[in-house]
């Protein structure tokens, strides 16, 4: 049986990856991490979506230790989310080590259930520039997991080279445009769906959606062309 594990937050990107995986794999598991994120509603949204979409299993893991080690506006209510980059060139929403931990735990879970594929919605074209969302990082993590577990695990990143407009097209391609638009939580201020409209995440999401709706046919054609080039 062809199994996959999706790293799932309940946001736009991971939900798009989840619906795509459900169309491609025999059995899909979702794994969500409780790391003390700014909005506890994220966990509830992920649980509701996993149930609605009918995943084989949805595991919520407590990794709140990360909150004690990594200071970020995504984990601390007293740190406002800022549009400005810090001295290190990263936004204050960067949680150091987050995806290292998430992919390691997802790899352990995949090993235990006999899945060979891990799917994550990280993306190099996102505005953030997080180092643990880059393609070279994912390839390095993939190599480490394979060597450390002596198992042929593959980390898939369906969104790695897509912009936000094309990510909306991918959701639409998998018959999930409305679900992703109305039921996911991407907003830094904890508002489901279209969000607050002001935070960096909402701005990126809104611009991408409007562009897709205005240029639907051309963008879908561009997405299909990219997919054919990668296959």
From Swiss-Prot:
GO biological process, one term: queuosine biosynthetic process
Keywords: ATP-binding, Ligase, Metal-binding, Nucleotide-binding, Queuosine biosynthesis, Zinc
UniProt xrefs under InterPro entries: QueC, Rossmann-like_a/b/a_fold
NCBIfam families (alphabetical): 7-cyano-7-deazaguanine synthase QueC (TIGR00364), PRK11106.1 (NF008317)
Protein name (database record): 7-cyano-7-deazaguanine synthase
Catalyses which reaction(s): 7-carboxy-7-deazaguanine + NH4(+) + ATP = 7-cyano-7-deazaguanine + ADP + phosphate + H2O + H(+)
UniProt cofactor(s): Zn(2+)
Co-factor binding details: Binds 1 zinc ion per subunit.
Assigned protein family: Belongs to the QueC family.
Binding site for ATP: 8-18
Keyword match Nucleotide-binding: yes
EC number: 6.3.4.20
